[in-house]
Amino acid sequence: MAVGKNKRLSKGKKGLKKRTQDPFSRKDEYSVKAPSTFAVRDVGKTLVNRTTGLKNANDSLKGRIFEVSLADLQNDEDHAFRKVKLRVDEVQGKNCLTNFHGLDFTSDKLRSLVRKWQTLIEANVTVKTTDDYLLRLFAIAFTKRRPNQIKKTTYARSSQIRAIRKKITEIIQREASTRTLAQLTKLIPEVIGREIEKSTHGIYPLQNVHIRKVKLLKSPKFDLGALLALHGESSTDDKGQKVEREFKEQVLESV
C-alpha cells in the first residue's frame, strides 16, 4: 500500500451536506395599502425578491392581485361572504398602492341562498363608469312569499322574470354609468340590492338580492395623480410655502 494514502479517511467526505441558503434572506417585505374608500387601509404584507441587476422589485410587485375579505376592509362581519380583489398599480417606498380589481361571493354563501320552492333570477350588465372603467356586474335575486300567502311555492312566471330582469338591468345601468369606480364600490355591497328589491316589489316580491360578482373588463390609461388622490396622498399637499421675512435695514455706526 502506498505511503500517505488512507482510504478510510477519504470516505467520510461523501456524506457532507451542501450549505443551503435561506430563500427568505433574499426577500424584502412590502406593505399592501387599500384605497381610502375602505375603512381599513392596511391589507397586509407581501414578499418579493430584492432588486438585483436588471431585475427590479417594483416591476415584480406591479400587477399583483390580492383577494381580501370585505369584512376585514370595513370592520364589519356582515360582509364576511364578500371577497374583494385589489391590484397593485404603483409602489412608493415600501408601500404597494392598490386599486379595485373585482368582487365575488364565497361559494358557501352562494350555495346557502339556493333553495327549493322559489325562482332564481340572474342578470348581468356591462357598464362604463364616468372615469372610463369597463365593468360587468352580475346580479342574483330570489322570489319570496307574498303577505298572507298559503301556497308553499313561490314560482314566478316567465313574463315576470323578464320584467324583473329588465328592471335590474335598468337600475344597474343608471347607478353605475353616473358614478366613478370609487363611488360605485361603496354602492355595490348593499345599496343597489335594496334599490332593486324596492322597485320590483310590484312585479313579484324578492329576497336576497345581491350584486354577486363584479368583473373588471378594461381599465383606462394609468394615471398616477388619480391613484394618489384615491389613496389620499395627492402631490398638491406637498408644495412648499413662501416664507416672508421682515427686512431690517443695517445701521452703520460712525467712527
From Swiss-Prot:
Any GO BP: translation
Places the protein is found: Cytoplasm
Pfam families named among the record's database cross-references: Ribosomal_S3Ae
Ranges where the record places region Disordered: 1-28
Gene Ontology MF term list: structural constituent of ribosome
Record text on subunit structure and interactions: Component of the small ribosomal subunit. Mature ribosomes consist of a small (40S) and a large (60S) subunit. The 40S subunit contains about 33 different proteins and 1 molecule of RNA (18S). The 60S subunit contains about 49 different proteins and 3 molecules of RNA (25S, 5.8S and 5S).
Name listed for the protein in its UniProt record: Small ribosomal subunit protein eS1
Organism: Ajellomyces capsulatus (strain G186AR / H82 / ATCC MYA-2454 / RMSCC 2432)
